């Protein structure tokens, strides 16, 4: 799992919001470039940037600040906020942005998302921001009645590879991510899920890793010193290394079984209840498909 430190831009400065309310915007750093350099020095490989003014206005407002960051750090940067047409997508990607995030457009103009994905593939991500499970748009100022899982499934059908999922109630609260919401989403689609909102501790990082998510975004907790970015990145690396070693040990054990027999015993359970349904046997091909 990757950790993406966040920079939210308003009037060219780094700010943080509380529960998505623009009236609560608080400047946490004057210089996006210096902030990005700090993230890079702490081991970040990716960074998440949002043009808050652009998200609200429907067109880029802080692109120059974003380009200054790109010119001064060697990071993969994903950018969202006010990206509503192919011209803007191409504008960002041509300047070196690694991934652009389509938010309101995913809700209102899926044909545009389809076109962008067809042309740029994995360089396109979709941001799904929700209140009480319903998708919000226009910088969180407008609420729809579309369920976040429903929208995610539509995006999966289009071919979207990455979804950034934000529980708006969690934004800026530093009281932990919505694990239930994220787990449900991760189980519902095959897209790579990036968690956003409420991430504030190493325990949160471990919990998100355990869900099998692709990434986690952290902002306010880093600025306030509650989450040590370097420690979070190292923790993910260590957990991943341990999981890899465990997986290798399991693979070795399974290989020993298959050397003795073409079939291995398997306990079949109901996923939702855990009820044991039967004892069966599976071959190597069946095992691979079930993992």
Give names to the regions the model predicted.
Residues 12-23, 90-93, 97-171:
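Conserved anion-binding
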Residues 238-291:
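Flexible "arm" and connector segments at domain edges
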Residues 60-67, 110, 141-150, 175-184:
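Charged helix-capping and loop-helix junction motifs
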Residues 46-64, 104, 109, 164-175:
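Glycine-rich, proline-tolerant flexible connector loops at the mouths of alpha/beta enzymes
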Residues 112-119, 186, 206-242:
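C-terminal helical cap(s) of enzyme catalytic domains, especially alpha/beta-barrels
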Residues 73-99, 180-218:
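Catalytic cores of alpha/beta
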Residues 8, 39, 47, 79, ...:
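Conserved, mostly hydrophobic/aromatic
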